[in-house]
Amino acid sequence: MEAAGGLKRWIKPAAGLALVLMLLTQLQPAEMRRVLESAQWSWALLALILASLANLACALRWKAIVVKFGQPLTSSSAIVLYFQGVTANTVLPGGIIGGDVWRTLGLSRLGMARLVAAQSVLLDRASGFWSLSFLALSAFLLLQVMGQGLAISAPEALQILYGAGILIMSLTPLALWRISPKLLHAALSSAGISVLSQALTIAAFCCCLLAVQAQFSLLTVVLLCAGIFLAAVIPASIGGFGSRELASVFFLTAIGVQAESAFLGSVLLGLTATAQGLLSLPSWLQCEQNEKNA
């Protein structure tokens, strides 16, 4: 049983590594080297700042949800737990615990029932997805109002399927009213900061793309970011790298972005999370030490 659990723990990073290696075999090393040599690292630095602000907003979104669930939680505690979760996801690939589970356990240590704590983390995740869909739908409507067509090189059926998925996800919060009005109120209480957090994340991604000199339409990238970031939840990544890079290449090459730039832009975004995870590592280690000494 223990061996099976250990094997399961390594499936996700192994799949992520396989995805990255598969992508690398499809890219041109010489072109990747050229892109990196001409990269504008000031954009990457700005991306790190924006990504950090995005995670800060995510932590405050989660705090608002937890408070609506009836658990007192200070902003500082929420921020510490959230960034420790980033460490668990990025610096400890395939390791002891995932970021969402870490946050759930953190709330349970503060006295919150574990099931309710897990619900708050799940609703926090869902709120982020809804915000991505809302921004994508808004970008699509703006493109229509501005009379700009969608220059997407993909089968029409796939475009319709993607659009339908975005629309459905944008409307799914309405289903919470039938499931639990309490959940809907908790989601609405953090809606504004949730949209802000996702807008900051998209801005960070755009900065990463600009760092590797990708040329793109901002509104079209906002439209496609829902698919790119949602792909990141697929359990096939190592340290946060894998499924997002595959989705980035898939979606962005459809709008004319060079495959190498799409891949490297996504990798740069992942490195902003890795940097934040490393900065939060001392806090994570201290918490682990306190648990052992308790």
Regions flagged by a language model, labelled:
Residues 1-83, 132-134, 138-234, 243, ...:
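Predominantly cytoplasmic-facing regulatory/coupling regions of multi-pass membrane proteins
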Residues 56-61, 94-103, 233-248:
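Transmembrane helix boundary and interhelical junction motifs in multipass membrane proteins
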Residues 76-80, 95-99, 109-126, 257-268:
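Membrane-interface alpha-helices at helix entry/exit sites of multi-pass transporters
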Residues 86, 90-97, 125-137:
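Mid-bilayer segments of alpha-helical transmembrane spans in multi-pass integral membrane proteins
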Residues 87, 123-126, 230, 271:
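Transmembrane alpha-helical cores of Major Facilitator Superfamily
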